[in-house]
Amino acid sequence: WWDPQLEQEIKRCGNNNHLLAFHICDWKTPTTDMLFDRGLMGEGCIPVKQIRSWVEAAGFNGFNEVEIFSNTFWKEDQEEFLKKIIEAYREHG
């Protein structure tokens, strides 16, 4: 999302059969930690749906893996966190 060549790089990887996984989270701004303050889809500035469309157009048809490193979310009830993930994915993923 921050790389101006991202769409072209995704296409290149797809053309070479190198799209093996698609990990999803969002980047919160401002962030409190470079690794452990990721957000649910829709909480930050990453255009997840747009990137997903590029990945799928490049031939990826595997699972979308939600991967949210977050000290805040890890402290929550994980059943409730899972519900939030599902809701955010349906709306913004």
Explain the meaning of each model-derived region.
Residues W1-G93:
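Histidine-acidic metal/acid-base catalytic patches
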